Amino acid sequence: MSLQFVLGPAKMDHRRTMVAQLVATLMAKPQDQFFYLVPNHIKFDTEVDVLNRLAQAFGQPDLYAQTQVQVFSFTRLAWYLMKNEAAYQVPRLSAAGIDMLLYRILQRHADELRLFGGEISQTGFVTQLAREINELQTANLQPEDVVQLAANAQAGDLQAKLHDLAIVYKDFVAATADKYLKPADILVQLNAYLRRQDLHGTHVYVELAGFAQLPAQEQGIVTTMLEQGADVTISLMLDHKVVDRAPENGTLFYQSGRLYYRLYQYARIRQIPVSQDIYAETPRVAPGLVALDDFWRGQPQAATGYEEPNTNVHLFRTDSRQTELAQVGRMIRAMVAKKHADPADDYHYRDFLIMTRHLDAYQTMLAPTFHELEIPYFVDLQRSMADHPLVELINALFDIDAQQYQYRDVMRVLKTELLMPNINGQPMDRQAYRQAVDLTENFILKSGYHGQRWVQREDWQYFQLTEGDAGVETDQNAEISRQINLIHHFVAETLPPFFKKMRQAPDGKAAVTLLVNFLTSQGVTDQLLAWRDQALDRQDVRAAAEPEQTWQTFCGMLDEYVTILGAEPFEITDFLALLQAGFEGASYSQIPSTLDQVLISESGMVQSQDHKVVFMVGATDLVMPDRIMTNNLLSDVDKENLQLTLSSLDGDHYLNDSAVVQLGDESCLNYLAFLSARRHLFFSAPLKDDQETDLNWSNYVRRIQRQFNLREHTYLGTPDPTNADARPFVGTKRRTISHVIQVYRDVLTTNTDRNRVGAPLQPAPVWVWLRQQLTRDPQFGELARQLMAGLSYRNQPVKLTPASVEALYGHQIYTSISKLEEFYRNQYAYFLKYGLKLRERDVFELSAASTGEFFHAVLDGLIKALRSDQIPLAQASDQQLGQYLETVTRQILDQPQFTILTSSNRMAYLQRQLINTVRQIAFAIRNQSKLSAAEPKQTEILFGNVGKEHGLKALDFQIDATHSVHVRGKIDRLDQIQVADQSYLGIVDYKSSQHKFDFQEAYYGLAMQMLTYLDAVLHNEQALVGSDQAAVKLAGALYMHIQNPTLKPKDIQGGFEAALLKKNKYKGILLDDPQLLEHLDSELQQGNGTSKVYPFARKKDGSYSGGRAASLVTNDQLERLLQHNSQLIIAAAEAIFAGEIQLNPIRLNDKTTALQYSPYLSIMQFDAMLAENAYRDLPPLSAKQVLDLLKTQKGGENHE
């Protein structure tokens, strides 16, 4: 029985000293039992290393076996000693099972709990409580100890927490005692077992040199071994003994010094012999790292700086985290590739350790970076199962029932690809399934199907209405309907019966049985196994293990649920909460795919000390030292208040350290990380984070840099073409070619810069050589040449061939004028939208087009109903108008396209708003009619053909002998004004936003609608007014803003009706004909002023003015506008038939562009910085300039 300490700083080889002690004792006492204990995290590596050292010591390097020496972690020691003990055979209780049990306890004692009762339903609380219970157990505190702590605490939150903890903890211990074995119980059982053993002749070596702490339970194991006669040797990272007084927090070796002090005092009080301390004296690290160790510990020999740089410590900065990882990878490849005279000096991937304080910032970059560099790696962090598709399937499955088949929930289930239909007894082909699900998703987004629609027996009918649709179902639509109904009926036939049985389940056991049987019968387990096999085929061992581990964890949680809650009524909400908490606490068992791979970890974790090279990435002042945050039920203040009471209890009781203590340990934690390296230590940090915020070196790194006169290197993500040192950018062939391309693109961009002066830029010879080598490589050359060819790529569409034009458009174009406006905005957008017919998928929503259709339909129906009953609009009373409106609106809302307005409470509210708006507009039009001689003659007048609808004659233009264009459209309203023998026709277009006639846009072909409609009226004059009528004149084209205006107090000072008339005033152009204008507004016939209805004013001299909007045009001016509009139509058709598809978006007035709301940006890849991509800037023109230009232009001359 004795206690022995092996001390020394991190630079020393503690294990060498420990193994030497073990060998000496083993030789002297070969029949004794030897245990070498290390943290579980590094057990395997330590076991291999210790056995290798023993083999060397006994002269058997090639083949060595040892039965008397066992290398274990504490929990593995428990298995070894107690595997046949009854106490060790009881069922294990996982983290999920613990959560379930605590959840039931909380519910049972809800009325007794002062604080915890109201927290039961809070997400994460049960898991947080489980952590607190585990901390109490590892601190060797029993329920009666917590009761005593509560009794001694002052009234307040702490006492209430301890009161609740005592109730829950007591019930928890009673519920698990002799029934379940919890993780914390294993060491309790081991301690009890050891107390019954005679350990004389047992030698225990505890290696703690690589880390600083030993939890209270493990300390209890060590002290029990001492009491039972074992010889215990403990290595500690400590450069001096701590005998008389405990160390102060904040000192470098606080944790190990505190442990030394506690164990020494324990042995001294119990008169257990303490042997003379042994110091590890053999350095295990390179000289430069020895110097770093001395400096960090503040040794006298390190007090002055170094003139020569430290050759074992290096640092560099990069422009981003991505570049930082890439540079680390490049260095690793270079070091592995370099061969030395002595093979023992060569590097393997397993010799490298990459660490940072928190891997989150690098997580998404690891895989692409190291895969591209072809570096095998292993991330030494536990990964939660919470995001596995099986977990998503279960959650979404029950959400479907709870939320009544909402779109997102059904899609969540289908997209897990774990529940799939069977075709002829076999699972559906995955690609065919994905296609069917995608089509179904598009359909329900378009139709708004949800709820009971999913479970109806009737087929869903897919339809797609397009221009020219003759109303006949196509084979393509029938096939899409088949695929959609395959998914629809799979859901309808599979889920409702399952949900019905679950609702009828009498208890938890029955419900869980139904769930497992359902998942198994639906082939979920088969799909998981298929995923495993596919991963194995890819040689992805890690991914292959995940499906089975997740299913086993799931089944284990269900077993525990049945054991703990199986006899109680089944509550789906509670069940899902427990499952989710269980999966969040569950993690995959990490399986390295190869023995030779780079290890990636966090500096807060225990690390093996056999890595030759360590990279400390992300070494910024944000994480070195770290910002310590705690999220425990017992706060740091609570723990501080408990320290005095804890010291009065029997035994050793140590709660987890507070944030203050942990912050004090940061220096030691980083010291251990630095000294994990044996040969080289690299510090790196990005200059900026992802948000372009500047990042600074850690003060730790700055101190080291100053002390050792270290040179800082900076690496950029993009190489300098003129720099002859290409080494930072040379890696795998694929990665190197990407940098070669960057160099040549930079050269190309620089040399094509119009503002550049001087000789052309040339790449450094090394880049020319790299390009030649890569493009001539037998295996890689073809790909390299393809990638390099991208340098000559220009983002310019190629003109269509005549054959392509004919295939897309034929010989005749039937079009609306808005399509040609699109052509003038951007030719390529026209090609995508109307040539290739690309479009965004339809969504079941109330769009601007839908509301416009509603307004048009109601106003059309209202005016037609009044005309049918021979009631002039101006003479309709308020009551009459209201009744007609109500009738027409009801009829319109009954139409299928407006069912969306009854699909939800929100839509019902919007329906009321739409009805109010159209009512206001109807009354506004009636009031306008009272002041004007203009009367609505027709509404919704179609010219040209749309599908099966036939209207007036289209506007037909012959382009050449074989090509023509036919323009169609629909005029919202045609007004007629009869003045003596002269008839005038004017058009009104309803708009849901403010519009005016823009001469500039009309000139450039961006706003041709109104002029085209006027032209259509002229071409269909006889059909509109009859052949017996004298020639009509065009009155003009006006916009009416459909709105329910908000009026301010100042607006209604002149009267409410006058304010509404002003808000609904027409905008557009009118014929500058005094005879016409006089009859448009009766209020101005005898006086002067501005019209309340139309966009003109009458001056005192009786003449008329269009004001700033230049809304009055002469007959000649109108004719020129119409002629120019026709020329634009012809010019657009000529360009389309010629195959023109230029990427030429317009930019108007230096702000408005054709790309602002385009859905095709990702296809066009337009970049104004590229020489070949530029906006087509249209010079601003006033109305006068446009009219003057038209006057001077000759017929057929290009409008630009």
UniProtKB/Swiss-Prot annotation:
Keyword ATP-binding: yes
Keyword annotations: ATP-binding, DNA damage, DNA repair, DNA-binding, Exonuclease, Helicase, Hydrolase, Nuclease, Nucleotide-binding
Cofactor: Mg(2+)
Pfam families from the UniProt entry: ADDB_N, PDDEXK_1
UniProt-listed InterPro entries: ADDB_N (IPR049035), DNA_helicase_suRexB (IPR014141), P-loop_NTPase (IPR027417), PDDEXK_AddAB-type (IPR038726)
MF (Gene Ontology): 5'-3' exonuclease activity; ATP binding; double-stranded DNA binding; helicase activity; hydrolase activity, acting on acid anhydrides
GO biological process, one term: double-strand break repair via homologous recombination
HAMAP family (alphabetical): AddB_type2
Family: Belongs to the helicase family. AddB/RexB type 2 subfamily.
Complex formation: Heterodimer of AddA and RexB.
Listed name of the protein: ATP-dependent helicase/deoxyribonuclease subunit B
UniProt organism field: Lactiplantibacillus plantarum (strain ATCC BAA-793 / NCIMB 8826 / WCFS1) (Lactobacillus plantarum)
Gene: rexB
